[in-house]
Amino acid sequence: MALTQEDIINAVAEMSVMEVAELISAMEEKFGVSAAAAVVAGPGAGGEGEAAEEQTEFDLVLTGAGDKKVNVIKVVREITGLGLKEAKGAVDGVPATLKEGMSKEDAEAAKTKLEEAGASVELK
């Protein structure tokens, strides 16, 4: 019995952030493509000025852990709900997208918490 598109989507929805990142890497290798190239090409198609004004969803990207790595891991776990191993993997593997599609208020609050813990963070 073949898997349906819905089955695949449900399976991905149950994965942790780290598992999804590993899946993406495996798919890039298998098919010889890069997900980053598709993301970069997307905003160029529309008006960049309009996109900047209308942005309502933000991605929280950890760009550095700083000296207080343990504190950063604790905050990453709090924000994402990841387990210790997954949070440590995200902190060790910077840059790492911690959360996608966040509202501006939630993204700013998470960014502030991470910066207070000693991390460097970007909102995209």
Swiss-Prot record:
Biased composition (Basic and acidic residues): 102-116
InterPro entries (UniProt xref): Ribosomal_bL12 (IPR000206), Ribosomal_bL12_C (IPR013823), Ribosomal_bL12_C/ClpS-like (IPR014719), Ribosomal_bL12_oligo (IPR008932), Ribosomal_bL12_oligo_N_sf (IPR036235)
CC per GO annotation: cytosolic large ribosomal subunit
Molecular function as annotated in GO: mRNA binding; structural constituent of ribosome
Stretch list, region Disordered: 102-124
Keywords: Ribonucleoprotein, Ribosomal protein
UniProt keyword Ribonucleoprotein, yes or no: yes
Highest taxon listed in the record's lineage: Bacteria
Gene Ontology biological process terms from the UniProt entry: translation
PANTHER family: 39S RIBOSOMAL PROTEIN L12, LARGE RIBOSOMAL SUBUNIT PROTEIN BL12M
Entry's family note: Belongs to the bacterial ribosomal protein bL12 family.
Function: Forms part of the ribosomal stalk which helps the ribosome interact with GTP-bound translation factors. Is thus essential for accurate translation.
Subunit structure: Homodimer. Part of the ribosomal stalk of the 50S ribosomal subunit. Forms a multimeric L10(L12)X complex, where L10 forms an elongated spine to which 2 to 4 L12 dimers bind in a sequential fashion. Binds GTP-bound translation factors.
Full protein name: Large ribosomal subunit protein bL12
Encoding gene per record: rplL
